[in-house]
């Protein structure tokens, strides 16, 4: 007789998944969390815990004075680990874990912030029918300073065309590439303070605490979630890094291709050398990228032929907008670094390029060293049972008063337009190969806003020292903001495990401009609530600062100009002092020496309770002894002090739960 195996218990599967998520978000090993046995809802199980361990007020007291959760949560809290030897853990994990707290600290620590500060942990209790839970929340404030004086020296007002060409190399490089490559060099840089600690102990060696969990790889192996997660991100990032680097090279090559041609209506018989004959074969795109991508030879690309700022800016906007359609039609480009044969195999050159485009694009993508590339396989069409005859189309005569419609033929593309179409197709397909996290382009569209601002200055004839200085400074400020917000969005919103358990409540960016003496000249504040705070902040800041550029050098604004300016920057209530905003618009930016950028965000996450009876029993004894010390006005022991716990006294009977008696 055969016995059928019963299916796995659904609750056990959910429990293991919860323990796995908790391990990733606390930096602990899976073994530690399975020993801890996390529980979110303690409804009808409150009697298993000490009274102080289940209320928001009690956990707040334990967190700040007894267990010191702000720093304890950063340690290796596995059984019999050095941090758990004596007071207050006694060889076991703590009675609570703040799910996601260690992850937030790690994310902030891994970026190039000069200072990191965390507000006091706040606990909120929710008790309703069938639910009793506790949440923790904190506000992180991470900041660093930009040396604006360096940007002043960067500007060459006598040769602004050359300055623009230098800027575009950094713009087209897409800071997201550097962001994904930011793995080791700047980790742990700067200072970290926690408000829950006494002043003399607020400077916390976070990096040392976080690395303690990964010191013995032979012991923890892939269960050291903090370390393994970093390795996993690094490995996944290499593939995205190759794709993003290729996209950058394509955009740079296309921009340099546009610059390589003399401006319209200029007779220039000098030709660049060497010549490149197109379409020499199906793989002309590879030769195109090798010829025009950085590093480039300015002389061979004839940068001196770029006649006007407007032309350079238009080319930058065109390259930045790839793979979207061009904002303005391209004029036919002749000469330059290409020798265009009028016909090949009986077809026009542009027609041949268009016909071969799909094959050429596919070969170019296949040539990239992408690990485990997801190849697209066309699905075969389902076989039809019998061939159906083709329907016969009858030509219907036009109705009375109706004119015959003539077939519209699309106008033939110029050579430059066909080059753009091929480059755009490659970029579009490569973007589809990116992971979701690396596909966040909403943070890097700010460059288009700023180049449109330059276009407006050019049309108004307002290119002067004040507007150019502000444009350059604000451009690089927004570049910093975009890179940082994208980093935070990547880790705090696009991480599935973190987003599933921890909520982003608020995002805020504060910008303070200082003079040479360190005095604040003006400050700006942008706030956005909700889970999409970072992307909404980026959109507002880009629009705001780009709209402020053309107000530079105009002195005091009258009432009508102020109203128009507030409309241009899409001002919202509670987004900074209006007088500060007006002062920023009227300021001479030459007095700005440095700019402080602060990134603040508030998160709320769950408190997990232990279900392990021994951890609950130790916690009762620790709470009892700590309460006695508080009543006797004695200081609390330090972590791992060899304190002998007194025996547990019986607790007073709790009144049974039921309806409250009327007063």
UniProtKB/Swiss-Prot annotation:
Posttranslational modification: Preterminal protein is used to replicate viral genome, upon genomic encapsidation it is processed first into iTP and finally into TP by adenovirus protease.
UniProt site (Cleavage): 189-190, 336-337
Molecular function in Gene Ontology: double-stranded DNA binding; single-stranded DNA binding
Protein's UniProt keywords contain Nuclease: no
GO biological process: DNA replication; viral DNA strand displacement replication
Cited InterPro entries: Adeno_preterminal
Alphabetical UniProt keywords: Covalent protein-DNA linkage, DNA replication, DNA-binding, Host nucleus, Phosphoprotein, Viral DNA replication
Residue ranges annotated as motif Nuclear localization signal: 367-376
Region (Disordered): 374-414, 632-663
GO cellular component, one term: host cell nuclear matrix
Compartments where found: Host nucleus matrix
Keyword Thylakoid among UniProt keywords: no
Modified residues (O-(5'-phospho-DNA)-serine): 575
Chain intervals with Pro residues compositional bias: 380-390
Pfam families recorded: Adeno_terminal (PF02459)
Quaternary structure, from the entry: Heterodimer with the polymerase; this heterodimer binds to bp 9 to 18 of the genome. Interacts with host POU2F1; POU2F1 binds to the auxiliary sequences in the inverted terminal repeats and tethers the pTP-POL heterodimer to the origin DNA thereby participating in the assembly of the pre-initiation complex (POL-TP-DBP-NFIA-POU2F1).
Family statement drawn from the similarity comment of this UniProt entry: Belongs to the adenoviridae terminal protein family.
Functional description taken from the UniProt entry: Protein covalently bound to the viral DNA that acts as a primer for viral genomic replication by DNA strand displacement. Assembles on the viral origin of replication in an initiation complex with viral polymerase, DBP, host NFIA and host POU2F1/OCT1. The terminal protein stimulates the template activity over 20 fold compared to protein-free templates. Neo-synthesized viral genomes are linked to two preterminal proteins, one for each 5' end.
Name this polypeptide is given: Preterminal protein
Species this chain originates from: Bovine adenovirus B serotype 3 (BAdV-3)
């Amino acid at each position: 007789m055969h016995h059928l195996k019963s299916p796995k218990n659904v609750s056990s599967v959910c429990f293991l998944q919860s323990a796995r998520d908790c391990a990733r978000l606390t930096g602990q090993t899976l073994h530690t969390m399975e020993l801890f046995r996390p529980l979110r809802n303690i409804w009808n199980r409150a009697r298993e815990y000490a009274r102080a361990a289940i209320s928001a007020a009690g956990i707040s007291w334990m967190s700040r004075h007894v267990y010191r959760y702000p720093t304890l949560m950063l340690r290796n809290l596995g059984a019999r680990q050095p941090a758990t030897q004596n007071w207050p853990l006694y060889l076991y994990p703590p009675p609570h874990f703040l799910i996601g707290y260690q992850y937030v600290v790690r994310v902030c620590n891994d970026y190039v912030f000069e200072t990191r500060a965390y507000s006091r942990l706040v606990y909120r209790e929710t008790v309703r029918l069938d639910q009793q839970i506790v949440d923790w929340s904190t506000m992180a404030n991470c900041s660093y300073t930009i040396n604006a004086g360096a940007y002043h020296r960067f500007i060459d007002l006598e040769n602004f065309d050359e300055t623009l060409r230098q800027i575009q190399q950094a713009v087209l490089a897409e800071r997201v590439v550097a962001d994904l490559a930011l793995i080791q060099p700047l980790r742990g840089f700067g200072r970290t303070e926690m408000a829950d600690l006494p002043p003399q102990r607020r400077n916390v060696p976070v990096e040392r605490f976080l690395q303690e969990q990964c010191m013995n790889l032979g012991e923890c192996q892939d269960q050291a979630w903090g370390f393994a997660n970093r390795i996993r991100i690094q490995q996944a990032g290499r593939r995205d890094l190759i794709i993003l680097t290729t996209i950058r090279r394509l955009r740079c090559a296309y921009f340099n291709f546009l610059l390589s041609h003399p401006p319209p209506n200029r007779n220039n018989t000098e030709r660049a050398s060497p010549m490149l004959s197109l379409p020499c074969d199906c793989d002309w795109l590879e030769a195109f990228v090798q010829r025009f991508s950085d590093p480039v030879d300015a002389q061979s690309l004839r940068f001196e032929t770029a006649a006007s700022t407007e032309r350079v800016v238009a080319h930058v906007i065109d390259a930045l907008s790839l793979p979207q359609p061009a904002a303005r039609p391209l004029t036919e480009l002749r000469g330059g670094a290409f020798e265009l044969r009028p016909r090949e195999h009986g077809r026009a050159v542009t027609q041949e390029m268009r016909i071969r485009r799909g094959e050429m694009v596919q070969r170019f993508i296949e040539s990239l060293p992408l690990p485990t590339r997801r190849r697209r396989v066309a699905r075969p069409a389902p076989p039809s049972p019998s061939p159906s005859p083709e329907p016969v189309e009858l030509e219907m005569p036009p109705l009375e008063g109706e004119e015959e419609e003539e077939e519209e033929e699309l106008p033939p593309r110029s050579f430059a337009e066909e080059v753009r179409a091929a480059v755009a197709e490659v970029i579009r397909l490569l973007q589809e190969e990116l992971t979701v996290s690396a596909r966040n382009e909403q943070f890097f569209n700010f460059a288009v806003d700023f180049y449109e601002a330059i276009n407006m200055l050019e049309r108004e004839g307002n290119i002067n020292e004040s507007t150019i200085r502000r444009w350059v400074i604000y451009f690089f400020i927004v570049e910093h903001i975009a890179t940082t917000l994208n980093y935070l969005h990547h880790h705090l919103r696009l991480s599935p495990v973190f987003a599933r358990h921890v909520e982003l409540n608020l995002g805020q960016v504060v910008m303070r401009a200082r003079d040479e003496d360190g005095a604040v000249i003006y400050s700006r504040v942008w706030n956005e609530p909700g889970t999409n705070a970072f992307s909404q902040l980026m959109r507002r800041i880009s629009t705001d600062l780009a709209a402020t550029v053309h107000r530079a050098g105009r002195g005091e604004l009258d009432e009508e100009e102020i109203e128009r300016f507030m409309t241009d920057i899409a001002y919202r209530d509670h987004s900074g002092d209006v007088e500060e905003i007006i002062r920023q618009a009227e300021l001479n930016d030459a007095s700005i020496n440095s700019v402080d950028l602060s990134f603040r965000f508030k998160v709320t996450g769950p408190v997990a309770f232990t279900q392990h009876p021994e951890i609950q029993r130790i916690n009762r004894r620790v709470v009892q002894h700590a309460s006695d010390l508080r009543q006797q006005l004695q200081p609390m022991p330090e972590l791992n002090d060899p304190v002998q716990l007194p025996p547990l006294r019986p607790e007073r009977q709790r009144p049974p739960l039921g309806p409250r008696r009327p007063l």
